[in-house]
């Protein structure tokens, strides 16, 4: 009797954990479909790094103080590059 009860409870616990994991995977897959693909995100990151460093180089060549270009959307300019805050 105890063995049967333990087996039923174990199966129920495994079923609950499996269902929860499946729901999390489904939610993650829906988020990935809605958002930008990783390649597009990488391109945006590269553009931001390039944009900030080039603007500082141009200002230095003009004999002006290098004013760091403001990065928007959770990014800040550090060491002539936009970095995620």
Swiss-Prot record:
Compartment annotation: Secreted
Tissue spec. comment: Expressed by the venom gland.
GO MF annotations in UniProt: toxin activity
Keywords: Disulfide bond, Neurotoxin, Postsynaptic neurotoxin, Secreted, Signal, Toxin
Membrane-spanning intervals of the chain: none
Residues making up the propeptide: 23-48
Entry GO terms, CC: extracellular region; host cell postsynaptic membrane
Disulfide bond residue pairs: 52-66, 56-77, 71-82
Entry keyword Iron-sulfur: no
Signal peptide region: 1-22
Domain of life: Eukaryota
Family: Belongs to the neurotoxin 12 (Hwtx-2) family. 02 (Hwtx-2) subfamily.
Known function: Neurotoxin active on both insects and mammals.
Assembly: Monomer.
Protein name in UniProt: U4-theraphotoxin-Hhn1a
Annotated source species: Cyriopagopus hainanus
């Amino acid at each position: 009797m105890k063995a049967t009860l333990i087996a039923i409870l174990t199966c129920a616990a495994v079923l609950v954990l499996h269902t929860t994991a499946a729901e999390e995977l489904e939610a993650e897959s829906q988020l990935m479909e809605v958002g930008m693909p990783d390649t597009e995100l990488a391109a945006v990151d590269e553009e931001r790094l390039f944009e900030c460093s080039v603007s500082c180089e141009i200002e230095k060549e003009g004999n002006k103080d290098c004013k760091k270009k403001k990065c928007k959307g959770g990014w800040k300019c550090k060491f002539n590059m936009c970095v995620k805050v």
